[in-house]
């Protein structure tokens, strides 16, 4: 009504100033077609996405959100230590091993964030799967020693993470112990061995007593801590009087395998978790030490 009054002169001067459009307003006004195109460009799919989110089960939304969060966290972890290495605040070898340790530990620690649905493990598997694709694409593009290294140790590492999620998941102590030995045990063996490994093993001059001892201790402790973590959340039941001794046997077996001079043939990121899985399967699945 105010606009009509403005054009007919029935309104006051103030209302005319407020309501009258400039002479060229009609020329500047978007056509119905351009308005439709603008809505399509700015808001395409928004109602559909909202409807899809509303119709999706809560477990799917939870698992999807956690997957995005963990993927972003994994990428950020690598970027932070890459930046520290570029600024020479940390040695490159130490940076890689710290990422080696933290990646496995933090990834396992994130498993309880996923829902209790049967599909939750597949959402969790997306994280190491994407990382393996990244390593493959980056490694195959380059013809350098660094690229070849990426296609060995780091790629094997994330493939073991992927395998453990799909096969064992959080209800199995076998996967938990295997990843603990691979990430914590093998990682600390290299860190300590490089700094204090002057005394070499007589049958493998590339390994040291300090590194092997640290692998046994750190692998055992991390395995026990992760078992306590998952048992406290109700995923596994542990009889600690029996479990601790068997964890020590698993750690010893993994340490022996890591000491064997076959690195050129089988990478530690494959031999250590495979040996751990085998021994853990024999020890933990044959009696009531751990009841799923």
From Swiss-Prot:
It is found in: Plastid, Chloroplast membrane. It is an enzyme of class 2 (transferase). Keywords: Chloroplast, Kinase, Membrane, Plastid, Transferase, Transit peptide, Transmembrane, Transmembrane helix. Its EC number is 2.7.1.182. The chain crosses the membrane at residues 98-118, 120-142, 148-168, 216-236, 243-263, 265-285. One of its GO terms (molecular function) is phytol kinase activity. Residues 1-49 form a transit peptide. GO terms for cellular component: chloroplast; chloroplast membrane. The keyword Lipoprotein does not apply. Pathway: Cofactor biosynthesis; tocopherol biosynthesis. Its main location: plastid. It is a multi-pass membrane protein. GO terms for biological process: vitamin E biosynthetic process. It catalyses: phytol + CTP = phytyl phosphate + CDP + H(+). Involved in the activation and reutilization of phytol from chlorophyll degradation in plant metabolism, including tocopherol biosynthesis. Catalyzes the conversion of phytol to phytol monophosphate (PMP). Belongs to the polyprenol kinase family. This is Probable phytol kinase 2, chloroplastic. It comes from Glycine max. The lineage of its organism: Eukaryota, Viridiplantae, Streptophyta, Embryophyta, Tracheophyta.
């Amino acid at each position: 009504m105010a606009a009509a009054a403005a054009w007919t002169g029935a309104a006051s001067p103030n209302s005319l100033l407020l309501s009258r459009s400039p002479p060229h307003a009609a020329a500047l006004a978007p056509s119905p077609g351009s308005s439709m195109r603008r809505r399509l460009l700015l808001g395409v799919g928004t109602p559909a996405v909202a409807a899809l989110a509303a119709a999706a089960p809560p477990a799917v939304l939870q698992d999807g959100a956690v997957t995005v969060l963990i993927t972003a966290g994994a990428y950020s972890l690598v970027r932070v230590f890459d930046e520290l290495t570029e600024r020479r605040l940390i040695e490159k070898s130490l940076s890689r091993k710290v990422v080696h340790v933290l990646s496995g530990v933090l990834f396992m620690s994130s498993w309880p964030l996923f829902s209790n649905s049967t599909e939750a493990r597949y959402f969790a598997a997306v994280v190491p799967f994407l990382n393996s694709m990244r390593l493959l694409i980056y490694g195959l593009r380059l013809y350098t020693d660094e690229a070849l290294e990426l296609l060995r140790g780091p790629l094997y590492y994330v493939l073991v993470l992927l395998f453990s999620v799909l096969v064992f998941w959080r209800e199995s102590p076998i996967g938990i112990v295997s990843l603990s030995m691979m990430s914590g045990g093998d990682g600390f063996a290299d860190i300590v061995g490089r700094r204090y490994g002057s005394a070499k093993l007589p049958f493998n001059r590339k390994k040291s007593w300090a590194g092997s001892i640290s692998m046994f201790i750190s692998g055992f402790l991390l395995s026990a801590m992760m078992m306590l973590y998952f048992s406290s959340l109700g995923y596994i039941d542990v009889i600690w009087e029996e479990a601790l001794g068997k964890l020590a046997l698993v750690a010893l077996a993994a340490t022996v395998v890591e000491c064997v001079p076959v690195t050129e043939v089988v990478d530690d990121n494959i031999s250590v978790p495979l040996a751990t899985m085998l021994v853990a399967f024999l020890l933990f699945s044959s009696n009531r030490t751990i009841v799923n």
